[in-house]
């Protein structure tokens, strides 16, 4: 893919060259117009591998979207422009781990590959660790219905890397459920194996604390509905943040 570095900045097609912007990236890009028709991609034998890739990419995108939906309340204003793409990329890595299904129908089995998501930052430019230096503990209930986020005592002036002009801060603890995804031959698409639990979530907010006074610490519990039974094909995620 070519990238324009000259003084001309425009988008659109000139001759056989298409000029465009990519969200989250600087500069203007260019590529040749053309390629196979939609019908060719969908039916021609030589595009079988392309169809398989498209099918699995769609499943990975759906799985990534479910994570974003489950954590949507805490993610408001806390993601970078490439967050969606980065999550889809992780889902694809998980998808490639499946050795039980045919290519084009491989599962997105998050429940067996959870380590891929451990430590994922929704904003790669500003991490939680770069903002808060307050010691904390994370715990989870055996039934996977409650996530605990406990912060310890601290001096905010030296423990919180707050933006200029800020006077207060608060912590956020979120819990969310994401199902594994499998290809449904009847519909020709990927679907959650447990749609009832998929995207179930809850978010708890701490009290606003002043930056110029001692912080006593607090306990934030985020819980899912009592009586909910977590199955083996779902993963329960915990996300913490500060604002």
In which residue ranges do the predicted regions lie?
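Long, polar/Ser/Thr-enriched low-complexity segments
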Residues: 1-126
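Charged linear interaction tracts used for macromolecular binding and regulation
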Residues: 95-243
């Amino acid at each position: 893919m070519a990238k324009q570095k000259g003084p001309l900045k425009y988008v659109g097609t000139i001759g056989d060259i298409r000029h465009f912007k990519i969200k989250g990236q600087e500069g203007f890009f260019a590529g040749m117009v053309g390629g196979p028709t939609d019908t060719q991609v969908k039916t021609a034998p030589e595009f079988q591998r392309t169809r398989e890739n498209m099918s699995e990419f769609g499943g990975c995108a759906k799985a990534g979207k479910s994570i974003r939906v489950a954590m949507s309340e805490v993610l408001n204003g806390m993601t970078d422009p490439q967050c969606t793409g980065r999550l889809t990329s992780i889902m694809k890595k998980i998808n490639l781990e499946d050795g039980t299904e045919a290519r084009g129908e491989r599962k997105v089995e998050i429940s067996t590959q959870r380590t891929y998501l451990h430590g994922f930052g929704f904003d790669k430019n500003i991490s939680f660790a770069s903002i808060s230096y307050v010691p904390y503990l994370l715990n989870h209930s055996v039934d996977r219905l409650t996530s605990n986020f406990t912060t310890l005592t601290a001096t905010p002036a030296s423990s919180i890397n707050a933006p200029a002009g800020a006077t207060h801060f608060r912590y956020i603890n979120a819990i969310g459920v994401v199902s594994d995804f499998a290809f449904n031959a009847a519909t020709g698409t990927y679907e959650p194996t447990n749609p009832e639990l998929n995207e179930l979530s809850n978010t708890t907010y701490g009290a606003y604390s002043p930056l110029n006074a001692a912080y006593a610490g607090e306990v934030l519990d985020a819980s899912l509905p009592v009586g909910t039974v977590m199955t083996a094909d779902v993963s329960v995620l915990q996300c913490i943040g500060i604002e």
